[in-house]
UniProtKB/Swiss-Prot annotation:
Species in which this protein is naturally found: Brucella suis biovar 1 (strain 1330)
Pathway: Purine metabolism; IMP biosynthesis via de novo pathway; 5-amino-1-(5-phospho-D-ribosyl)imidazole from N(2)-formyl-N(1)-(5-phospho-D-ribosyl)glycinamide: step 1/2
Keywords: ATP-binding, Cytoplasm, Glutamine amidotransferase, Hydrolase, Ligase, Nucleotide-binding, Purine biosynthesis
GO MF annotations, alphabetized: ATP binding; glutaminase activity; phosphoribosylformylglycinamidine synthase activity
HAMAP family: PurQ (MF_00421)
A Gene Ontology term for the protein's cellular component: cytoplasm
Protein name: Phosphoribosylformylglycinamidine synthase subunit PurQ
PANTHER family, per the entry: PHOSPHORIBOSYLFORMYLGLYCINAMIDINE SYNTHASE SUBUNIT PURQ
Reactions performed catalytically: N(2)-formyl-N(1)-(5-phospho-beta-D-ribosyl)glycinamide + L-glutamine + ATP + H2O = 2-formamido-N(1)-(5-O-phospho-beta-D-ribosyl)acetamidine + L-glutamate + ADP + phosphate + H(+); L-glutamine + H2O = L-glutamate + NH4(+)
EC number: 6.3.5.3, 3.5.1.2
Active site: 87 (nucleophile), 197, 199
Cross-referenced InterPro entries: Class_I_gatase-like, PRibForGlyAmidine_synth_PurQ
């Protein structure tokens, strides 16, 4: 299974993402730049890492979402290719219209960098099939604008159709996200956006491997 990592000016978690994928799959992902208009046909998983694309000017992810490469990402997603955006990558997916809702400034108005606990609220997706329903996993967060919001109708649909796949466990919501939402998928289930950083917990020697199953599930391999 082959993966691709999207590179944009200002992202700073691309090396972490590349290292995680290389360790899990045994091969380095291909890298695709912001001005590229296509993604290799044999790619099974596209990842948009975290950071501060284009300095977070206008809104987080707003400029990145309008780069040529995102049209290529959109075309792949429409064909069923797995797409995953983490932190700024999640913000970009929202700005690109690939996922519903918005990410606002943290309720504390402060940058938050710490470990949180996540509840797996839907283990019946390709991304989360390596977990058990209700399982609590550890994951670090590092963001200033991670407060997820959506209107009542959108929230009802997300909750009712099982599109909320990760929720901050009780008492650990770091940003004020509505319904403690930490990660969602699209209706088809092949596009995931989440604020926490699973790529930073894939080796026991580095503090834990709770994030490993997420990548393995998306690629259809054994964790």
């Amino acid at each position: 299974m082959k993966s691709a990592v999207i590179l944009l000016p200002g992202l700073n978690r691309d090396r972490d993402m590349i290292a995680a994928l290389t360790k899990i799959t045994g091969q380095a992902p291909v890298t695709v730049w912001q001005t590229d208009t296509s993604i290799p046909d044999d790619v099974d998983l596209i990842l948009i890492p975290g950071g501060f694309s284009y300095g977070d000017y206008l809104r987080c992810g707003a400029i990145a979402a309008r780069m040529p490469v995102m049209q290529a990402v959109r075309e792949k997603a429409d064909k069923g290719v797995m797409v995953m955006g983490v932190c700024n990558g999640f913000q970009i997916l929202l700005e690109a219209g690939l996922l519903p809702g918005a990410l606002m400034r943290n309720a504390s108005l402060k940058f938050v960098c710490r470990e949180v606990k996540l509840e797996v609220t839907n283990a019946n997706t390709s991304f989360t099939r390596g977990y058990k329903p209700g399982q609590i996993i550890r994951c670090p967060v590092a963001h200033h604008d991670g407060n997820y919001f959506a209107d009542a109708e959108t929230l009802k649909r997300l909750e009712g159709e099982g599109q909320v796949v990760f929720r901050y466990a009780e008492g650990t919501n770091p940003n004020g996200s509505v319904n403690d939402i930490a990660g969602i998928v699209n209706a088809r289930g092949n596009v995931l956006g989440m604020m926490p950083h699973p790529e930073n917990l894939i080796e026991a020697a580095h503090g834990g491997d709770d994030g490993r199953a997420l990548f393995a599930g998306a690629l259809g391999i054994t964790a």
